Amino acid sequence: MKNCLFTLVAACLACAGCFDNHNRPADVFTVTSLDALANTNRAEIVRLFLRGAARPVTDADLEGLSDSVLQQLDLSELNLEKVPGKVWGLKGLTSLWLVRNKLAAIPDEVPQLPALTYLNLDGNQITAVPDSLSGATKLRWLRLNENKLRESPPSLSALKDLRRVYLRKNLLTSVPEVVREWTELEDLALDDNAITSVPDWLGTALPNLKSLSLKGCPISRMPDDLSGLRGLTTLSLANCPLPSEEVVRVRKALGDNVAILF
């Protein structure tokens, strides 16, 4: 009965938008509180969601989790300034949420999670992306919204499997040059940054891009050549100061198959 209740609670939270839903199976063993964790065989837990727990999560709380069974871990909204060291021993982890903590940096230990495909660090105080993150080569989904990033290092070109990157509400003044190396990228969000221009390569270097969002950036012109963006399904330029003639040009260049939001 307890296991059913935990799974039901997790499902309700997911429906409410508390968690991102990316292929999470519904029939796995899920725990959603520290109280439940204390009364559970930890070696059987597949999904552990401790978002907003009543007290800080410590290494002792994570003791006994199976490094081959646990796949998803949510340690969001816990006022963490440092990630518990036990996390980096969970070698089977595929998804890690560290949303709205007090992290000033992306932990250098992230590459110690060889199966990690999803990393969510939204709403922290991160000012830079370390070169060490280039070792997390299985990453497909990276969220760094609402931080204090000004740039991304070229070393991140090693992240060849990235499909979705979200960098909304940072301090970027240009599209990071490393983005052009992420040729498998399907979804890129740079909303509400101080980006004033879009590099010419963005129109040609990302053949698999389906969604591009630059909403709220002070951009007045898109690249002259947009031929490489014909695979787009959605382009958001809402609240960008594009002159009317530029709006007409972009619409004509991309055609009717792209939903363009101005």
Identify the residue ranges that each predicted region occupies.
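Mid-chain, structured segments of secreted extracytoplasmic proteins
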Residues: L70-K102
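Eukaryotic tandem repeat interaction scaffolds
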Residues: R143-T204, S211
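Leucine-rich repeat domain C-terminal region
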Residues: N193, A205-R221, G228-F262
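N-terminal capping/linker segments that flank leucine-rich repeat
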Residues: K2-Q72, K82, N239-P241, E245-F262
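Leucine-rich repeat
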Residues: G64-V69, W88-L93, P111-L116, S134-L139, ...
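Conserved hydrophobic beta-strand positions in leucine-rich repeat
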Residues: L48-L50, Q71-L75, T94-L98, L116-L121, ...
